[in-house]
């Protein structure tokens, strides 16, 4: 079981993001209407990103910037 570190929601509560760490990498669960759309690890081009990066990604998901 993975412990969720932080949860964010869109204003209309249709989009939700859950931030958690697994194997020393932050991940963001991207959810619409209770359905998991994607679990995105916060790694790009071999770079493991910070919690702050994961929070930005979660916020972008909730705002609809990431689709």
Regions found by a protein language model. Name each.
Residues 1-31:
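Short N-terminal "domain-start" leader segments
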Residues 1-9, 32-67:
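Mixed-charge, Lys/Arg-enriched low-complexity segments
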């Amino acid at each position: 079981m993975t412990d969720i570190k932080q949860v964010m929601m869109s204003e209309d509560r249709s989009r939700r993001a859950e931030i958690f760490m697994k194997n020393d990498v932050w991940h963001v669960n991207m959810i619409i209407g209770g359905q998991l759309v994607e679990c995105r690890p916060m790694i790009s081009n071999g770079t493991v990103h910070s919690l702050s990066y994961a929070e930005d990604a979660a916020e972008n998901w909730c705002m609809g910037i990431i689709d």
